[in-house]
Amino acid sequence: MALSSALIKIFITFLFLQNHVNSQYSSPSKPQPSLGSTISFSITKFDDESPNIFVKGDASISNGVLSLTKTDKYSGKPLQKSVGRATHLTPIHIWDETSGELADFSTSFSFIVNTNGSRLHGDGFTFFLGPLHFDLPKNSSGGYLGLFNPETALIPSQNPIVAIEFDSFTNGWDPASPSQYPHIGIDVGSIDSRATVNWPLDFVQTNALGEASINYNSESKRLSVFVAYPGSGKNATGVSFVVDLRSVLPEWVRVGFSAATGELVETHDIINWSFEAAL
């Protein structure tokens, strides 16, 4: 009996130690904040040494401004075929796989798109939510806005992306516009917007400051965007679309901006940015 009791004690001790080792050295494959968590940030002035903003392609930070596309260093004029992206490195838990819960989020930013007074200009910029490891696509200049590649741009199953596009040139997949009227669109896995509204970019003064507000309500699943040009005399414009983000996005995403020029050019500058998400 004494020998049997000793063996049982040894076995129990072995199981305890094994469990302790497993719990000590196992690490989660993704961030694990609890439900009810909130992530927020506010950038009133961009810093080129900020560890939280990752720029790629032609995007750069200078004098407190995030420039998404490239300009000539001598003349300051925008360059053709420029593509840039800036991403906030904080992972956003946009929905929870276990509970099925969706996050609410809101973001606002000020921007300047300078067309240099040209009637024809392009191509635009986006605010987007995409996978944690989302590289800058090849051949994504022009109407692909630094977000899509030509081969899969119209195939939603290939693009786990949701974006608000500020599109200044009408391409073949855009709403018909004989006058090349710029538009704001909601993109769900495709460059072909699910909902659009006219963007009064050509009817405000050069270098006018625009203000955008984007919100997602997890109960109604409505994604909404409003854009205004304070002091311009133009009414705010807005568009919304109902989308279940769980059907498009991975559980964890990053948020950011992208932009592109093609044969036509303009500048795309983000002046400030705030974001908040709550799950």
UniProtKB/Swiss-Prot annotation:
Gene3D superfamilies: 2.60.120.200. Glycans are attached at N116, N139, N235, N272. Induction: Accumulates in roots during colonization by arbuscular mycorrhizal (AM) fungi (e.g. Glomus intraradices). The keyword Signal applies. CDD domains: lectin_legume_LecRK_Arcelin_ConA (cd06899). Keywords: Glycoprotein, Lectin, Signal. InterPro entries: ConA-like_dom_sf (IPR013320), L-lectin (IPR016363), Lectin_LegA_CS (IPR000985), Legume_lectin_dom (IPR001220), Leguminous_Lectin (IPR050258). Belongs to the leguminous lectin family. This is Lectin 9. It comes from Medicago truncatula. The gene is LEC9.
